[in-house]
């Protein structure tokens, strides 16, 4: 093996096995492209995106780490979300959630999304 080389296991690598998943339809109602990264709390994604945010609380994209999904203006696509793992804590992002994702934390996040107007049609 050469210094700096990457040695990858043979076979198929399964990610997020055993975690709750959800398919959600997303439309970009904005005028600019929106890109969402693999570990971003999806309920807090850009306000120009229209989707069922209450079901996305505590979820992120079910894609490999370090990758992202791009939504072009006017585009509608279906993505798969996966439950946030580990300690299930969401910090920062757009300030809608800063909590552990238990039922109480999900209620707090939903309340913040409603106050910000993000539960209505997408922000244009």
UniProtKB/Swiss-Prot annotation:
Reactions catalysed, as given in the entry: urea + 2 H2O + H(+) = hydrogencarbonate + 2 NH4(+)
Gene Ontology CC: urease complex
Alphabetized GO MF terms: urease activity
Hydrolase in keyword set: yes
Source species of the chain: Bacillus velezensis (strain DSM 23117 / BGSC 10A6 / LMG 26770 / FZB42) (Bacillus amyloliquefaciens subsp. plantarum)
Entry's family note: Belongs to the urease beta subunit family.
EC number: 3.5.1.5
Gene3D superfamilies for the chain: Urease, beta subunit
Coiled-coil intervals: none
Enzyme class: hydrolase
Cellular compartment(s): Cytoplasm
InterPro entries reported for this sequence: Urease_beta-like, Urease_betasu_sf, Urease_subunit
Pathway the protein takes part in: Nitrogen metabolism; urea degradation; CO(2) and NH(3) from urea (urease route): step 1/1
GO BP: urea catabolic process
NCBIfam families tied to this protein: PRK13203.1 (NF009682), urease_beta (TIGR00192)
Name the UniProt record assigns to this protein: Urease subunit beta
UniProt keyword list: Cytoplasm, Hydrolase
Subunit structure: Heterotrimer of UreA (gamma), UreB (beta) and UreC (alpha) subunits. Three heterotrimers associate to form the active enzyme.
UniProt keyword annotation of Transmembrane present: no
A Pfam family recorded for this sequence: Urease_beta
SUPFAM superfamilies: Urease, beta-subunit (SSF51278)
């Amino acid at each position: 093996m050469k210094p700096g080389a990457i040695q990858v296991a043979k076979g198929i690598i399964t990610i997020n096995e055993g975690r709750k998943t959800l398919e959600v339809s997303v439309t970009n109602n904005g005028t600019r492209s929106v890109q969402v990264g693999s570990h971003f709390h999806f309920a807090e994604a850009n306000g120009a995106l229209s989707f069922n945010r209450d079901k996305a609380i505590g979820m992120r994209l079910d894609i490999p780490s370090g990758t992202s999904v791009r939504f072009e203006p006017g585009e509608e696509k279906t993505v798969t979300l996966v439950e946030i793992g580990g300690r299930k804590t969401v910090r920062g992002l757009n300030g809608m959630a800063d909590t552990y994702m238990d039922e109480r934390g999900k209620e707090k996040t939903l309340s913040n999304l409603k106050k910000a107007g993000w539960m209505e049609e997408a922000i244009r």
